[in-house]
A protein has these predicted regions:
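N-terminal beta1-alpha1-beta2 submodule of the flavodoxin-like/Rossmannoid cofactor-binding fold
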Residues: 1-76, 83-85, 90, 94, ...
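Short, charged, surface-exposed secondary-structure boundary motifs
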Residues: 38-42, 115, 141-144
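Short, conserved loop/helix-junction motifs that constitute active-site signature segments
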Residues: 68, 94-101, 124-127
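Redox-cofactor binding/interface segments in oxidoreductases and associated redox assembly factors
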Residues: 76-77, 105
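Short beta-alpha junction loops
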Residues: 107-112
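Short, aromatic/basic amphipathic alpha-helical patches
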Residues: 116-125
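Glycine-rich phosphate/pyrophosphate-binding loop and the adjoining helix
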Residues: 130-162
Length: 162
């Protein structure tokens, strides 16, 4: 089985989990980057993205350095923004054909995941994916800390089930 981890990370929380998955599984890593960068100021980001999220704007993405057609399993990681997946992940999931592929979504959040994982599942399934083993991974509410609320054992157990 060939595996790829595709993720978008704003404050490195999602990146940390993606790297842990890669370390344990040996899956390749691929970070999604937008053509136009988001601001580094968190408060400005909130203001900047709330309208985009409501309108489900899909930002333009830079070309990936991996070809998803070469993989059977794709793990997709997103931070939760305003109770949903980040717009770059929305773009990725809605603009790729996942027919014949297993997609395994994970989201990182600070306590308010609401329907983010369901949205990721729905978008992947709408594009042909067989969605399996989604998970929500919680960090503390301190946006600058890398402290997990979800236990490391739970995360490792989930990774082992991939």
């Amino acid at each position: 089985m060939s595996g790829l981890i595709v993720y978008y990370s704003y404050k490195n929380h999602t990146r940390l989990i993606a790297e842990k998955i890669s370390e344990i599984t040996g899956f390749d890593l691929c970070e999604i980057e937008t053509v136009d960068d988001y601001t580094d100021d968190y408060d400005m980001l909130v203001d900047e993205t709330v309208d985009n999220l409501k309108s489900q704007t899909k930002p333009e993405l830079q070309l990936l350095d991996k070809e998803i057609s070469n993989y059977d399993t794709i793990v997709v990681g997103s931070p939760v923004w305003w109770y949903t997946i980040a717009p770059p992940i929305r773009t990725f999931l809605s603009s790729n054909d996942f027919t014949g592929k297993t997609v395994i979504p994970f989201v990182t959040h600070a306590g308010w995941p609401r329907s983010a994982i369901k949205e990721a599942n729905k978008l992947a399934e709408a594009n042909g994916a067989d969605v399996k083993n989604p998970i929500e991974i919680q960090f503390t509410t301190d946006h600058d800390a890398d402290d997990l609320v979800t236990s490391d054992d739970d995360i490792k157990s989930w990774i082992g089930s991939l």
